[in-house]
Amino acid sequence: MSTAEQTQSDIMHRFWHDDLAAADPEIAEAVSNELKRQQDKIELIASENIASKAVLEATGSVFTNKYAEGYPGKRYYGGCDYADVVETLAIERAKELFGCNFANVQPNSGSQMNQAVFLALLQPGDTFMGLDLNSGGHLTHGSPVNISGKWFNPVSYGVRKDDELIDMDEVAETAREHKPKLIICGGTAYSRLWDFPRFREIADEVDATLLCDMSHISGLVAGGAHPSPFPHAHIVTSTTHKSLRGPRSGIILWNDEDLTKPLNMAVFPGLQGGPLMHVVAAKAVAFREALRPDFRTYAHAVVENARALAASLEENGLRIVSGGTDNHSMLVDLTAKDVTGKAAEAGLDRAWLTCNKNGIPYDTRSPFVTSGIRLGTPAGTTRGFGPAEFRKVGALIAEVVDGLAKNGPEGDAQVEESVRGRVSELCSQFPVYP
């Protein structure tokens, strides 16, 4: 074998056989460090979870290599036989899981799934309604910095000051005044049940389409731990990586066949090209997992754990926005402690408790500082925490916050060190990817 042939052989051997550590030590180190972070810290970000080994395996599968523009049976590329199998399974499982007639499993993200609905139903400048960001809504529901607020005319509804619940009478009055073409229910930081029947009643009154973005609660809906938006919503969207415990992606669900062509055309070719088939495969895996009886147990445990965490926080002197939670999440108002959400996020992270700063209703601080933090129980529940563990977590959070209230943003180093030790002990009892 010549030198050139040997060199080429060595190159090909590396290509086919080198693992990540050999091919890219820097990225391998970052992945290893991220795994250790997830193992050693308690994840309390409400929008995060821990996917199964099977979901990770599908996400990293050879479907990464496959282009599959179009839909099953109607592709623009050859060689899509097994891509069709994967996508058809994902569609059928999604329909079974959520009790609907149609599903599009191609959206690459939550933003793109909602953009596809806008593209299918609205023209630039059309009016739609969504929950105000300061009341727990999402960027894609009309924030002025998002395409939904730049290309369309968003009108917001919010929560009452006295009880921090959505005022359905205000929703109805706003809808009658502005006559939106689309009404969105669903949010990213609202911990109470949504009145889906009333939203549909209001939508029908003003001849609007009702979209439910159930990204945060879809796992709870799938597991019977939260009311379903069907049959009330015309269209339902959801990410798949939050309480549903799948890969990072999105789906669109509906019942009316008349919506099929505009929604499918909006996703492809309107918004996307080839779908991420490795992610579609992982979605199919996650849907199958969610169809199992043990997932129902998990979903109910998420809600039970959230209530235990909220109760513990209140018992330890922290106020929960709206007085509690009906789902997986809660907002903690730190105003009385004179602690910012930014400081709390940093202090809790030093204590190995991961959360995110979050605005509270009628917050006077900027979104980069905030007066609150958002907490959630999906990831902790996945690793095996029950109510007893979450009550301990609530007490640990309160200790750190009290240290911040006493000493300012630098916190109480001794308290944070003590909390780290107890977090480490908890995590060792409930390992991640052991």
Swiss-Prot record:
Site (Plays an important role in substrate specificity): 241
Pathways per UniProt: One-carbon metabolism; tetrahydrofolate interconversion; Amino-acid biosynthesis; glycine biosynthesis; glycine from L-serine: step 1/1
InterPro entries: PyrdxlP-dep_Trfase, PyrdxlP-dep_Trfase_major, PyrdxlP-dep_Trfase_small, Ser_HO-MeTrfase, Ser_HO-MeTrfase-like, Ser_HO-MeTrfase_PLP_BS, SHMT-like_dom
GO MF annotations, alphabetized: glycine hydroxymethyltransferase activity; pyridoxal phosphate binding
Top-rank lineage group of the source organism: Bacteria
Localization terms from the record: Cytoplasm
Record bears the keyword Amino-acid biosynthesis: yes
Coarse class of the protein's main subcellular location: cytoplasm
CDD domains found in the cross-reference section: SHMT
PROSITE patterns: SHMT
GO cellular component annotations of the record: cytosol
Swiss-Prot/TrEMBL GO biological process terms: glycine biosynthetic process from serine; tetrahydrofolate interconversion
Reactions mediated catalytically: (6R)-5,10-methylene-5,6,7,8-tetrahydrofolate + glycine + H2O = (6S)-5,6,7,8-tetrahydrofolate + L-serine
Residues at which (6S)-5,6,7,8-tetrahydrofolate binds: 133, 137-139, 366-368
Xref: Pfam families: SHMT
Keywords attached to this entry: Amino-acid biosynthesis, Cytoplasm, One-carbon metabolism, Pyridoxal phosphate, Transferase
Sites bearing N6-(pyridoxal phosphate)lysine, chain numbering: 242
EC number: 2.1.2.1
Known cofactor(s): pyridoxal 5'-phosphate
Cystines in this chain: none
Family matches, as PANTHER family: SERINE HYDROXYMETHYLTRANSFERASE, SERINE HYDROXYMETHYLTRANSFERASE 1
Assembly and binders: Homodimer.
Family: Belongs to the SHMT family.
Function in brief: Catalyzes the reversible interconversion of serine and glycine with tetrahydrofolate (THF) serving as the one-carbon carrier. This reaction serves as the major source of one-carbon groups required for the biosynthesis of purines, thymidylate, methionine, and other important biomolecules. Also exhibits THF-independent aldolase activity toward beta-hydroxyamino acids, producing glycine and aldehydes, via a retro-aldol mechanism.
Name of this protein: Serine hydroxymethyltransferase
Organism of provenance: Erythrobacter litoralis (strain HTCC2594)
